[in-house]
A protein has these predicted regions:
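Accessory, non-ATPase domains that flank or precede helicase/AAA+ motor cores in DNA-metabolism machines
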Residues: 1-247
């Protein structure tokens, strides 16, 4: 269950997901064979989240799965998809007293689900606090997801990220290419990509070992999707973290 496969559908082939069958197999219909296993899969924690997401938002499983696997160029396997890992030196930044206390508080939350709010005025250093927390998380071989409310915020945030961590983050939103999406899928699935910055749809990606979800500017109304599949990404982030026991 959860494997992504290519199957014949009408006159062409489509990517589908192996899912549990609640129905009796019809005797008078010939079932076609799977063409190939793509080598990609959805792990059990994401399966649990997809099923919960479907029930809570009253959306058919098929539509949720379309969000999960959409736009990834049919999950072809190319040698260019290799994830290149470079060792980098993360900079050390000096925190003020308030930032240090906030980081200590977050550090007490270990191996359990918790929701914390970092509140402060613009420029007060909230981002630096959660960057430091992410640094602690990835040292334990966990992954981090940072959600942004709008795509246009990505470039500025990416620059701040690179200045702190010393490497370019993986970015996920509707404007990136299918090939890039496929590479990110594989990197997350194999725990090669440690930190992802993304729009709300990034919540449905196959992180192997998700340790923390940051919802930046969580009050922003852009986290509410009101077309197609309707959901609130802030609320869904809390639910996914709870299922995965992320912070």
């Amino acid at each position: 269950m959860g494997d992504l496969v290519e199957v014949p559908f009408g006159t062409k082939n489509e990517i589908g997901v192996i899912w549990k069958n609640k129905y009796t197999e019809p005797k008078d219909i010939k079932i076609k064979d799977i063409k190939r296993n793509t080598g990609y899969s959805i792990n059990s924690k994401l399966i649990d989240f997809i099923e919960w997401f479907s029930l809570y938002n009253m959306v058919p499983i098929g539509l949720v799965l379309k969000m999960v696997i959409g736009g990834t160029d049919r999950f072809k396997t190319n040698k260019d998809d290799l994830i290149k890992i470079k060792k980098t030196q993360i900079k050390e930044f000096k925190l003020n007293l308030e930032q240090t206390n906030a980081l200590k508080f977050l550090g007490k939350i270990k191996n359990k689900f918790d929701v914390s709010v970092l509140q402060g005025t613009t420029g007060s250093g909230k981002t630096l606090v959660y960057f430091e927390r992410i640094k602690e998380i990835i040292k334990k071989n966990n992954q981090a997801l940072i959600l942004l409310p709008e795509i246009f915020l990505t470039n500025d945030f990416k620059s701040r990220f690179e200045d702190f961590f010393g490497f370019e983050p993986a970015i996920w939103h509707s404007k990136i290419t299918p090939k890039k999406k496929r590479i990110i899928w594989k990197g997350l699935m194999k725990n090669k990509i440690k930190i992802l910055i993304g729009a709300r749809s990034a919540l449905l990606l196959p992180f192997k070992n998700l340790g923390i979800i940051i919802v930046d500017e969580e009050h922003d109304t852009s986290y509410k999707q009101d077309e197609g599949v309707i959901y609130n990404a802030r609320d869904m982030a809390i639910s996914r973290a709870n299922l995965k026991k992320s912070n």
